[in-house]
Amino acid sequence: MKIMLANFAKMVNDSGGLAKVTVAFANEMVRRGHDVSLLYCDGHQGDFFYPLDAKVRAYNLCWQKGRYIQVPWWMKLKREFLRPFSPVMSRDVNDQFMQKYLLGEVRRLLELEQPEIIVSSQPAASRLLLCDIAVEIPVISMSHGDPEDYFHIYPKGEIPAIEKSAACQVLLPSFVDHIKRRFPEQKVVVIGNVVPQYDVTADLQADKDRHKIIFIGRLVKNHKRPHLLIKAFVKLANRFPDWELELWGAESNKAYTKSLQHMIEKNGLQSRIHLKGVTRDVAGVLREGDIFVLPSAYEGFGLSLAEAMSMGVPVIGYKNCPAVNELIKHEENGLLCEDGVDALAEALQRLMDTRELRVQYGAQAKKSVEQYAAENVWGASVYS
């Protein structure tokens, strides 16, 4: 089958979850004998962070005939002017850019590739394909987050594309109703992300001079919120002198990263709290961990969290965080706590205090993500 992936986001040297899932999906479809092409939008040219199979034909829509197609200054100005008043209208400027400057290239590539099915990673991509170009090729719209957001913070012009899709894929069972409630006749399938199943897991029983709390995720203030974890650790640092905190992930904003570093230095914990940057060895980082914490406000799935669970590491998250509160079963495979620093510190203290509890939750965590093994996820795939 000829499959086209439409991920209208950056891919070059991007270590984020969407890039990881996109590459994994493309590579798996090639392995299964399908013919795969990929459309993406990136201001840079170069290699992907995650290795893409050489058989996948990748097209950067933002580079056409050797020329960078960027958002014009007046569109940027309009987008930033609207942002404080209406995030929805601000996002719609991005859609207008795609309609005006990228639509023709998408048409050309559709004619060139002649796909039999298109897998879209964003409502914006689905809108361009189904509403603006009006393709007759089946389009499957994937949700990499909570689809409830589509009806509140996404441009209204993208919503009809959800109904026009041949099917919608969501990551968790609780997300099905968020689409079905609006479009009862729409086909919605639940297919989670593939989680690696590690044979060699974290040794939580080992006697160590130092224990590690691990965070892996992009350093984003209002999303992943690593500052809450740093503040919680500061509260416990004196009581647990043999513990340290490692934060792994790409910088999203220099000022925010500087504020994290300042927080660490102000509390004199430079030797115990480390901003480590991006890693290509997630398994190696997790294997050294004793506790994994994801203090996100929201998640679509929480891939780094699931990978930590597969490594047999006990986990902590916030009970009001979508996806996290489905992966973590409180006091079974980890701990869920109320939002905020104090509650997070209390949850951390429980696990830091008791190795037996860490071992118990870690073992259950590993079992609970076995359902996301590659053979289970790809076997359920509507594309296979």
Question: For the regions a protein language model found, what residue spans apply to each?
Answer:
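A conserved mid-protein helix/loop that constitutes part of the nucleotide-sugar donor-binding site
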Residues: 16-24, 211, 220-235, 245, ...
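Glycosyltransferase donor-sugar binding loop
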Residues: 38-45, 216, 244-258
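Acidic anion/phosphate-binding donor-loop and adjacent secondary structure
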Residues: 149-153, 180, 192-211
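Nucleotide-activated donor-binding/catalytic signature segment of Leloir-type glycosyltransferases, i.e.
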Residues: 258-277
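Aromatic "clamp/platform" in nucleotide-sugar-dependent glycosyltransferases that forms part
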Residues: 278, 297
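Short hydrophobic beta-strand element within catalytic cores of glycosyltransferases
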Residues: 314-318
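Conserved acidic donor-binding segment of nucleotide-sugar-dependent glycosyltransferases
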Residues: 319, 329-331, 335-342, 350-355
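A short, well-ordered alpha-helix in the C-terminal region of glycosyltransferases
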Residues: 343, 350, 357-371, 383
